[in-house]
Amino acid sequence: RWGRQNVMHHPMKINGQHNEVAVDRLSNPDAYHFLMQSSENLIQLAIQTNTQVLIHGAYNSPVSDILSNYPSIDSARKVVFSRLDHFKSLGGDHVMFENSISPLFDYGDPEIENLIIEHQYRLCYDTSHGFIVLHGDNSKLKASMAHLRDQVVHYHFVDSMGQFHDSLELGKGAIDWQPLKSVVNPDATDIFEINLKDQYKSNRMRASYQYLKASWQTSG
């Protein structure tokens, strides 16, 4: 099940701020233009090169910041989905959307997941983000991964204590990995998106691969 695919990550920041899909077009036109243009350019490149683009549905803007530009979380989420619909229409099978710890595009709430399924998005599932949203509940993480399984095309396998964004090596956090084998889409690709002290040393990623391999071999 260990396939290969080139995945381009859209720019994470502009002027020191996260490149949020929900950026307000009126109050921050430069960031809005950057979001749209960079995403559209990468999608075109992915089509030309038969590769993939990963776009974060959101990052982690404080709710207070979101509500300074939108009347409610729901209205901001509708803007996010509208823009993701646009990127989906351009990219088709060359674009995917990753979950965040923001209520604008998170996995773990069945109602939001149902909405995501209705929009037929191709998904990247970051396990640490889902675990944090679910406050470290392993049974709910498994249920979420099972619910979205058929639409997931790429995984970020990352451990976490489930309290904040810690990006831990597998086996160093609180995620129970063994039961997750049955709810992972076997056709999806994956990476171990672990925080590295030295970007030129991938030992923690390789250790995570070995940990998951051993865990899933014993799960039958």
Model-derived regions: residue spans:
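Short, flexible active-site-adjacent loop segments at beta-strand->alpha-helix junctions, enriched
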Residues: 10-14, 57-61, 101, 161, ...
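Glycine/small-residue-rich interface belts in oligomeric ring/scaffold proteins
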Residues: 1-12
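Generic surface-pattern signal
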Residues: 4, 85, 89-92, 150, ...
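Active-site acidic/histidine proton-transfer and metal-coordination neighborhood
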Residues: 17-123
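Intrinsically disordered, low-complexity regions enriched for glutamine and histidine
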Residues: 7-8, 54, 154
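Histidine-acidic metal/acid-base catalytic patches
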Residues: 16-19, 23-24, 32-43, 47-51, ...
